[in-house]
Amino acid sequence: MMVLQQQQQQRLWDATTTSNTNTQTQQSANVESTPTKVCHQENAATHTFMRHMSNSPTPPSPLRSLSDCGKSFEEEELELGENCEMPQNLSSKRQARELDSELENEVLDLAPPPKRLAEEQEEEKVASVNPPQPVAFAPEEMHQALQLQLHSYIEMVRQLAPEAFPNPNLATQFLLQNSLQALAQFQALQQMKQQQREDPLPSYSTPLAKSPLRSPSLSPVPRHSKSQQRTPPNSMTANSLGMSSAVMTPNTPSMQQQPQLQQSTPKPTSGLTVASAMAKLEQSPEETTDLEELEQFAKTFKQRRIKLGFTQGDVGLAMGKLYGNDFSQTTISRFEALNLSFKNMCKLKPLLQKWLEDADSTVAKSGGGVFNINTMTSTLSSTPESILGRRRKKRTSIETTVRTTLEKAFLMNCKPTSEEISQLSERLNMDKEVIRVWFCNRRQKEKRINPSLDLDSPTGTPLSSHAFGYPPQALNMSHMQMEGGSGSFCGSSISSGE
């Protein structure tokens, strides 16, 4: 046991000597350090050695001073701090472990001290009570400052480059005008700001408790009736412009331009004009006419006109001679195709309906003769040209097999003689005039396709099948094969007359 104590004391002595050597090296490196610091380090080392001697199980050494007897190990450790390195034994390690476990649950107070908080609060109060006022200059002061800057600038330019300003008065005038303009703008801006401060905009917001809740269906959105929704887009524009029976194309501006057009239209000023406008609206046929009814009438009118054998130009000419309203073929065509505005179609409908009734009654009186122009003209007018003008011949529909036979005959001879046309008409059971017109139309079509071909030669030379895209075997087919087979009617039709 004594041996262990001696070994421990020897180790402590070695540690003390090493600390002394460290302090000596620090003193040699730091020449400017004071002697008091050196003494303090030596005393600390001595105290450390004496403290460890007192904590040992052996009786206290007589070298320990009486002043240190009343101090515990913790107090001496707090006094020394981190000034020197001290050897650790088992007891110091155990105490350090206990201190660490206590510091685990300790909360650090990182808040600033109350004194600094009070100073910051005082500074904030002073800043809020006396905010920094912006520097405000009167217009006269600004004008004087601008003039001073102007004069100094001119003097500086004269000194640096006198040849740059041969006439300094002009430069002075120019700069003075610019400064005056800037001053006027600044004054106007200040006046606007003052007015905004004096007259704030009134707020029209309604409290939430009093504002009624409105659904999207109840919102004040302009709505149209069913008849207006089914109206073509050109009708609203035509109504707003008050147009007459002029032709309205599909490219007519739609409802998007209606507000602008209404603004440009002069409004009625007197009560009489308003009353007359209301009377015209009441008498217009748009209220009693529906779009579906118009569509149905246009379809029926076209069918009846074709059945009676009259062209659109005939109808327009007859309406001009009978009722005093001249209409072109384009207007009748657009009416049948529903390409007119709703208002114009409503105006045209009664006139066309009247013409159709007159034409039907005339045909019925004549005993069902469709092309009896004399009967119709004697009933409706004195001259034949006053009602229908020209008459239109029937259109002939050609079957697919017949058209194929005609195409092959055209390849063999593009310009047949009258005898060949008669033979074809007998073989195909068709009218001779129809076959002649078909060959004429086919030659015109071939000219459009191949302008270089000479189809007007007096002799009907056979054409090459390769020029028209037909196989060579098509020219060697028999008449039985050409006539054999049943085909369906197709939509191709030719006109036997003008």
Swiss-Prot record:
Biological processes per GO annotation: central nervous system development; ectoderm development; generation of neurons; neuroblast development; regulation of DNA-templated transcription; regulation of transcription by RNA polymerase II
Q: Which InterPro entries match?
A: HD (IPR001356), Homeobox_CS (IPR017970), Homeodomain-like_sf (IPR009057), Lambda_DNA-bd_dom_sf (IPR010982), POU (IPR013847), POU_dom (IPR000327), POU_domain_TF (IPR050255)
What Pfam family does this protein match (any one)?
Homeodomain
Q: Give this protein's Gene Ontology molecular function annotations.
A: DNA binding; DNA-binding transcription activator activity, RNA polymerase II-specific; DNA-binding transcription factor activity, RNA polymerase II-specific; RNA polymerase II cis-regulatory region sequence-specific DNA binding
UniProt GO cellular component terms: nucleus
Q: Which domain of life is it from?
A: Eukaryota
User: Cross-referenced SMART domains, in alphabetical order?
Assistant: HOX, POU
> Polar residues bias: where?
228-251
Instruction: Give me the positions annotated for DNA binding.
Output: 391-450
Question: Is Transcription one of the keywords UniProt gives this record?
Answer: yes
What does it do?
DNA-binding regulatory protein implicated in early development. Involved in neuronal cell fate decision. May act as an octamer-dependent activator of transcription. Could also play an early role in specific ectodermal cells, and a subsequent role in the embryonic nervous system.
Say which family it is in: Belongs to the POU transcription factor family. Class-2 subfamily.
PANTHER family assigned to the protein according to its UniProt record, in alphabetical order: POU DOMAIN, POU DOMAIN PROTEIN 2, ISOFORM B-RELATED
Q: What is this protein called?
A: POU domain protein 2, isoform A
Naturally occurring in which organism (per UniProt): Drosophila melanogaster (Fruit fly)
- Which gene name does the record give? pdm2
